[in-house]
C-alpha cells in the first residue's frame, strides 16, 4: 500500500507554478520567453491598434479594468455590451482569452523546450513541427496483424465549465489565476457556445480558438492519463516518456477514489489490465486502443473507463460511446485513412520423401488504404466530378486565367497526394489524379469554348504538366542521397510532419 501511495503522490519536480503576475506587471519576462521560442509573430510585439486585437498590452489593461470596476453592474439591455467594460463584450473577451491562453501555455512550452534542448548539442528545434497529430504516425506504423480487438472511444464531453477549470489545478498553483479563469468562463460564455457536440468530435467557435483548444487539450490529458498510469504499473518494461511528442501529463494524484475502492486488491486489478501488446493513440476527440486480449478483457477495459470517468469528472458517461470491434471484421476510419486487416493467402509446398503436400496458409496483413468513396464524394461536393466519379468542368473558375486554373487544380492534387503519402496502396490516388486532371482540361475547354481534344491539340499536352510530377521525382529531391536499400522504404510510405488535416478542396492554399 505504501508503494501505491508513493506512485500516487504528485511529482513536484514536473510542476510549474503559474506566473500570474505576468498578466499584470512582469510582461518583460514573457517577452524574453516569447523571443526564445522563435515565434514568427508575437502578441507581445504587436502594436495595440484595432487591427492587432491580441496585443499583450491591451490584454493587461482590460484585465486591470475588470478588477477596478464593479462586476455586478452588468447591463441587461444589450447582450453584447457590459457596463464594466464599456465596449463590445465579444471583442474584449476574445482579446483577454487569447492573452490568457498565451500565458497559460508558458509552463507547457518550457517543458517542451527543456526536453528538446537535450538533442543536437542544445540546439532548440522549432516546436511547430512537433504536434499531437505526429504521435499518430507511429501508431499507424505498428503491425496490428497480431491484435484481436479495438476499442473505439469518444472522449466524454466536459458537461460543466468547472471541469475545465479543475483540469488545470495540478499545473496552475496560483489561486487568483484559477479565479480569473473561472470568472472569465462563467461571465462570457455558456457551455453550448463553448463546445458543440453535434459531431463525434469537438468543434469550437471561430473566436477564441487558441484559448479553448488549450483548455480542451488539458481536459484530454486528464481523460487519457489512466492509460499512462496503468501501463507504467502493469508493464515490466517501463515506457520512456518523450514529452515532445506525447501530449500527456502524469496521472499520480488523480485516482484517489480508485485506490479507495481497490486498495486491498490493487495488484489483482492491475493484473486484469496487464497487456504488453496494448496500442493506444488519441487525436482530437477520438481515441483508439488495440489489444491482443480477449473480448472479456476489452469489456473490462470498457466498464473500467466508464466508471473512472464518471467518478473522476462527476459526469454521466454512456457505455455507447465505447465500441468493441473485432479487428479482422471491421475497418478503421481514422484521420481520413481506412485501415483494415486482410487475409493474404499463400501456398506452401511440403515435400516428405515421395509425397508432396500443398498447404494453404492465410497470413494477416495490415493495410492503410485511401478511402476512395469519401474522396470522390468530397470532389463531387465541390463540383469536380459527379457522384459516380465522372470528371466535369468547374464553371465558377472559368473567369480565371489559364495559369490560375491549372495552379488551383495542381495544388489540390498535390495536397491529396501529400496527405495520403503514408498509404500502403496508392493506386486509388491515381484515380483521383485522373479526375482532377480531366476536370481541369474540361474547365479550360469550357473557358475557351471548345472541346477537350481541340483545346489540348491547340495548346499542347505540356500545358497540364503540373499534374505529371511523379512521387519518384519528389522523393529524389527529398532524399537525394538515399541508398538503393532504403529507396524501397521511402517509396512505400512517407509521413510528412507538416500534415495537420486535409485543407478545403476548393480553397486549399
Curated annotation (Swiss-Prot):
Record's keyword terms, sorted: Chloroplast, mRNA processing, Plastid, RNA-binding, tRNA processing
Domain of life of the native organism: Eukaryota
Subcellular location: Plastid, Chloroplast
GO CC, one annotated term: chloroplast
InterPro entries: Domain_X, Maturase_MatK, Maturase_MatK_N
Gene Ontology terms: biological process: mRNA processing; RNA splicing; tRNA processing
Entry annotated with the keyword Cell division: no
UniProt GO MF annotations: RNA binding
Pfam families: Intron_maturas2, MatK_N
Function: Usually encoded in the trnK tRNA gene intron. Probably assists in splicing its own and other chloroplast group II introns.
Similarity comment text for this entry: Belongs to the intron maturase 2 family. MatK subfamily.
Protein name: Maturase K
Species name: Anthocercis viscosa (Sticky tailflower)
Gene symbol of the encoding locus: matK
